[in-house]
Amino acid sequence: MKKRVGILTSGGDCPGLNATIRGVAKALYARMGDNVEIVGILNGYHGLINGEYREMCEDDFRGILTLGGTILGTKRTPFKLMRVVEDDKVDKVAAMKKTYKDAKLDCLLCLGGNGTHKTANLLSQEGLNIIGLPKTIDNDIYGTDVTFGFHTAVDIATEVIDRIHTTAGSHSRVMCIEIMGNKAGWLTLYLSLIHI
């Protein structure tokens, strides 16, 4: 019996999104062969709310390993309260459940950060089969040691800082560097330990 697996990316961009999507697809095809169909939910939860999805095939996952961004698209617009009907009069939870049902999904993989996982948890409580894939350069998702995107962010920031050192030295200057991380300091901590 074929299983239909949906996958979405939500929230901000981070390194490794397409590599993760590709890895999931390759694992599903390797394990299940012709018994799996992958459905790409376009533009994150907005696509799930608005019924924006498409059937995907193995060719869709070729050549994306090193591409930045996400082939599925994403939206970062936060929802004030997922269960509250806002000015647009759309019951977001009901709309997402409808798309899940209309797409005949057996499971939905949600690749994202804290906000993505809060919504994924809500959908799980609503009875949908959900798998959360933690993605954020902040490395601050509860219950994980390392999230997708974190180590790449460390590597890239390290390279940038190393280059700034030479510029600062050439001009006898001190430079201040602001590092992302939202409310978590993991990225800054790792970078400071590398540059001691």
Predicted regions and their residues:
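Short, acidic/small-residue loops that bind anionic groups at enzyme active sites
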Residues: L123-T147, H151-I156
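Short Gly/Thr/Asp-enriched flexible loops that form oxyanion-binding sites at enzyme active sites
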Residues: T20-V24, N114-L128, T188
